[in-house]
Amino acid sequence: MCIRDRYYIEALSKFPEDKNVVVVSDTIDWCKKQDWLQGDRFLFSDASYEEFGDGASVPYIDLCLMTLCGGGIIANSSLSWWGAWLQKGGDKMGKNSIQRHWQVVAPDPWFGIKYDMYDMKDLIPARWVKLYNDPSYIEPE
């Protein structure tokens, strides 16, 4: 199990086990092979990109799907951040959430050590749950 797996496994534990989990990823085949993503609880966004023309990625489909979810576990990516931000599960002012179990779990720190000089205090909204993500895994671009 790698560090990245630990982040997602711990984040999953913050959601009720009787709730479905929609897995959205640009490496969906890898996700389907993970032991910790097995069972009827997990639904995979498996739109075949080949159906949409040249086989190129069509992330807007995954973004739309994420906005329909009632919470989420996000990666340190702008796509997953916007997918969580645009959900209607919680109000944007940080008051009580509309859905009983609505929450977003976000990795903290967002970037690896290379980017420590940047002020990231406003990146993750106060109503989201920050979960430690070992920065040694986060690869610099």
Stretch-by-stretch model annotation:
Residues 31-38, 86, 113-118:
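Short loop/helix-cap segments at secondary-structure boundaries that form the rim of catalytic
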Residues 113-141:
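Leloir-type glycosyltransferase catalytic cores
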Residues 46-48, 108, 132-135:
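Residues at the C-termini of beta-strands that transition into short coil/loop
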Residues 48-68, 122-126:
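Repeat-unit-sized solenoid/scaffold elements
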Residues 38-41, 100, 124-128:
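A short helix-to-beta-strand connector/capping loop
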Residues 59-116:
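A donor-sugar binding/catalytic signature common to diverse glycosyltransferases
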